[in-house]
């Protein structure tokens, strides 16, 4: 079921035609939904909702300027909030007590060099077992570079700060099965222990599968053997949230030159 457009320029002061993109969400202790997004020329901003469908902008900027892009929020075991962000050549992070005021963590979480990529983006995390987490990431989609040629990898951590790259590739060139371009991966741990990875597939040549949002499935979170088109044409930057009702909602980005992201 489509719920339409939630946020678009001129929300948060974004200029018409510019991106308001990369949504990431979390359920707060009071049951509300907070959505963070990248606002072109402004930084990482946030909005809140009682039902996950109608959002009210929150004042201020969570992370200003060009310090961060493509955010992913994660609730730490101690209750604090962390935003993992893309900085082209590295993934960095910012931590907050209240989800509103963030302080940059020292160092980086993972570099593009360590991941074997020319540039890195879209960190997204799932807890694979108690005290062990896996981060998925992909090649950074650079404006003007054209579609195709993206691949997704992963890394693991026991403290959510230091990440070790998993051997091989999950999706894209070099992966054992699903070798089409794949970007902006987002993992969902299903009740049976399988991992569903949602991602954007945009081909460099016409024909074949349609462009848009796909879902791949893996028994171990490392080898993905099956994929299916979600029907969301040209959808990208997915975030899947389980609402307090138990339903799941997919937030994703789109772009219209007359409007923006």
Segments the model singles out, each with a brief description of its role:
Residues 1-261:
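Carbohydrate-active catalytic/glycan-binding domains of CAZyme proteins
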